[in-house]
Amino acid sequence: MVDPGREYPCSLASTLKLARRLRGMKQAHAAELLGVTQPTISRIERGELKPVGILRIRLMDLVSARIHPARDAALRRLVEGSASPVHLVCDVTHRLLAASRQREREWCRAAAELHGRPLWRFASDAIRAAEERLSSLGWGEHGGTHALTFTTGANGSNELRIVPGIQIWERMLLSDGSPARLVTSADEVEVL
C-alpha cells in the first residue's frame, strides 16, 4: 500500500559525497551553495548530522539528477519514444525525468503531470524491498551492480498505478555526472 509520508530511501551522507565527487565539487563550494559551513558538510558526509527542514530541501535539490536539454536530449527521446513501458527517474530522489507513452498508459497519468515530482510514495512493497537491497549489492559503487531485475506486485494506488510484473532497474549517469535510473517493465520472455 502507498505510504505518502515515507521518506526518500537514500543516504544523504553517501549521496552528497558521491554527487560532489562526480561533479568535481569541493566541500567548501557545496557549503556555499547550501548556505552552511564546510565543517557542516563534513559532518553530513560522515553521517554525524542529519539535515532537516530547508537544509534538507536544498541538499536534495543539489544532488538531484536533471536532464540537460541539449546534452541529454538523445536519452530523453529514446525513453519517451520507446514502445516499451519505461521511465527515467533521479536515482537519489526518484523524481520523474522522462516516461514513454506505454508507461503513461500503465500509470493512467500523463508524464507531464508528474515531471520533476518524486514517485517514491507510489512504490509497491516489492519496489521498497528492492530499494533496501541496493546498498548491499554495491549499487552505484565502482565494481558494484548497476542493474537489478525483480518481480513487483501492484501498489494499490488509483493515483498512479503500478502494474504487477517484472521490473528492470539500470543505473546510469547523466551528462552532468548525476545518477539516474532507467525503469523498464518486461515480459518473462524478454528477461530470459
What is the meaning of each model-derived region?
Residues 83-192:
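Sensory/regulatory domains in signal-transduction proteins
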Residues 1-21:
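A short, Lys/Arg-rich alpha-helix, primarily the initiator
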Residues 50-72:
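DNA major-groove recognition helix of helix-turn-helix/homeodomain DNA-binding modules
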Residues 24-42:
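Short alpha-helical DNA-recognition segment
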Residues 21, 32, 61, 105:
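Short polybasic/polar patches that bind polyanions
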Residues 68-85:
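Short, basic/aromatic recognition patches
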